[in-house]
């Protein structure tokens, strides 16, 4: 249900998504629950790339999946906060309050996601063309032939070579980098306002990773979409992000422009993440490779609470 004009006016016109004090809990053993996301707030402007960065277990992927309302299928519950999104028609809604049926209709059309491993997302028994076309026919009133043409055009958009032939191929016939391009094509098929990329380059070698990052930047300029980029790699953050939110143990500990985060990191954990990135020339004049001079940061224990 669209929000009232008063509520909509709280969202600046250039903002696509605003997450406010988001709280997510997972049921644990006995009567305990684990607060995986604790008071997270951030916003994403139109055409902007926001990087949500942190180590494994920091809550960054849970935050992204919660925006898509997918964590509820894994036993999680949203215990507080709002997820306000501006749709392509200008209406604003709180995704937390929408029905599952309504949210399902928004996935792919208004907001889409690209996962880390394309082989776990692509169906091995359907062709690439069929899988992209399915997303189109699900959200748009298109004939099978029209959907196939849109699938072809989208493959060309993401720079898949020989796109006509790839339409009739299966996922196992493509390389890892090509499969990830197909996943991005599926996410873009209905031209969503926001694309969530959940560590899309982690399983790829550095050369293909660079190609995917270049592709995302180029697509943003061509389409004008916003991006929420989930990663643990500060090197990737430096390449892709406009703004950065550093996440630790379910909380955002530092936020700033990508320049400010790298030029003057304020939190010890941010400095530790940056120090983990190898620096070209750091081993110059050394007789043998040395260990990276990591900054040690001891986080607080995970919050486990008794269920109410």
Where are these regions (language model features)?
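A short, surface-exposed alpha-helical micro-motif characterized by mixed small hydrophobic
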Residues: 237-239
